[in-house]
Amino acid sequence: MVELTWMTGGKQGSGIDVALGLFSRLMMKFGYNIYGYREYFSNIKGMHSFFTVRVSDKKIASIPSTVDMAVFADTESVLGEKNERGEIVHEGHARDIKKDGLLVVDSKLEKAKIGRNDIKILDIDFDSIISGVAKKFNKPTSDVVIAKNIICVSASAYLLGFDHDAVVEAIKSEFAKKPQSVVDLDVSVSEETVEYLKTRNGELASETINYMKSKGMTPEKILKNGDQGQQIYMEGFASTAIGKAIAGCKMQIYYPITPASDESVFIEEHPELGIRVIQPESELAVLAMTAGANVAGVRASSSTSGPGMSLMAETVTWAGMNEVPLVLVDHQRGAPATGQPTRTEQGDLMFAIHQGHGDFGRIIMAPGDVEESIEMTAEAFNYAERYQLPVIVLGEKAISQGSMNMSKSTVTAIKDRYRVDRGKLVDEVKAPYKRFEFTDDNISPRIKLGNPNAIFWLTGDEHDEWGHVSEEPTNRIKMMDKRNGKYDRILQDLKPEEKFKMVGDVNNAELLAVTWGGPSAAVIEAVEGNNKVAVMQIKLIHPLPKEAVEILKKAKNTVIIEENITAQLKQHIASVTGFVIPNEILKYNGRLVRYDEVSEALTRVMKGENKVILNGY
């Protein structure tokens, strides 16, 4: 079995984010599965960021709390740092390395300060490598220092025994759009790193103790699993963008906000997706334009985060009143207010269910990983048009800033089986046209703007079947029933796998773990091989699947696992069904849920604890 978790980090703006993609693609090239995650502070430059990449020969979508190997070019990443008031900003990552793991540091750092006698520590003279390359290219050192990220990846690959030619290929691929001079410089840095390490082979042999083999990473495994280019490096924010493209979305309208902006930037950088990107003056304008495009018959969407969701509430209610198909992706982050813009949380669930004033139909759905994000985002457009209502896809930073390998065939399969369903969108009607005609299924024929036989009115007021403002009591009752009467059909139409996922044998399990969204992959991995615990991942949050509720009620014992302080899904289930899940595992420190901390927490619940708060970094 191959199992390695790798970490690097440094100051934001120092180029370390390149190391995440470079190391990940290198591991993919040799046939391994990867899952990477990015943690960073909410400023542009100067604060600490770090990246974790897990490498395995099995499919993965989560990471553990500790790492096998860490490579840092700066002291702060290892020892931590304090702000000007003497408060701890972060505690450093020396503590995150497993016993007998490997830490690679700058030679300026005194090993004694690290305080770990149970790990292997190797020092590298980063400055000598950088200055040597700078001299070779006749450049000032300041122009080359950003290439320390190349040293981190190249040193890691060398210590793990990978062929250096593959590293060079990965560098060329990573910087393919850069000038050739940049590529040449980075390749030279990589080569100088290897030459530097070769001069210390005796020390390396004793330090690493054949580290590659200890992780199960052998040349035979590499050759067997080589992917020959059949794997895609998929980042979470790209998955929702690709889902929109598959659905035939033609407009992405957004206002910049972390972490949602990455999705729109990705779309803009990939015109082949066929989606026009527009950035108006405010979040209010964003959703008004999105709703208007959908009224005109164009599949349009927006993506935002919590503060943007708050500003968009009025337009969501307008879309609900006028039965306008609307797809909105909420990449959740730490809240309330500005909160923690670059940290993860699941604090928007109850808000999404009740966003805006009054009662109207809506669908809330939550993918659990990158692959589900593609498929469920695409389906959101079908749901929106089929049932003529707003659909909110609850993403989160835990997914949007995660990255994993995905086979090209998986993406192709999602695209091939996707069928556009525009519901009751018609091309022709006979006058007089009733846009809000009462029907048996509460869904009226809908037509694009511009048809001379289809004159209708859209207002924020209550209206009759033509759209005229109406305050007549009987009409009010019928219209309220119409807008809110679509849930039974939604629950009937959707397949079980679209609503929730079960893992394990719930009939024989002692505990059923209920979760949603970002923590799902970690929870599922945490119970692998444990027949005492089954997992229910709820994908369709609202309306709540009736079949899932029946399973919950029959389980011997249940626990909710969420990334918020109030167990919002638990609240939702209780308010709809009256069933109260008795146990909670919650994490709300802004950090990713790790599978090993879930495993430990489940053990504590099974021993009688009914509430466990996770605080892993």
PLM region spans:
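Active-site cofactor/cluster-binding pocket
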Residues: 1-245, 546
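Thiamine diphosphate
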Residues: 1-11, 21, 25, 30, ...
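Anionic-ligand anchoring segments at beta-strand to alpha-helix junctions in alpha/beta enzyme folds, i.e.
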Residues: 2-70, 247-282, 304, 514-515, ...
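Short acidic, glycine/serine/threonine-rich loops at helix termini
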Residues: 17-21, 46-49, 82-84, 114-117, ...
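Conserved thiamine diphosphate
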Residues: 70-72, 343-390, 396, 417-428, ...
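Internal gly/pro-rich beta-alpha loop/helix module
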Residues: 120-149, 153-164, 168-190, 194, ...
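Flexible, low-complexity linker and terminal segments
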Residues: 226, 233-237, 385-617
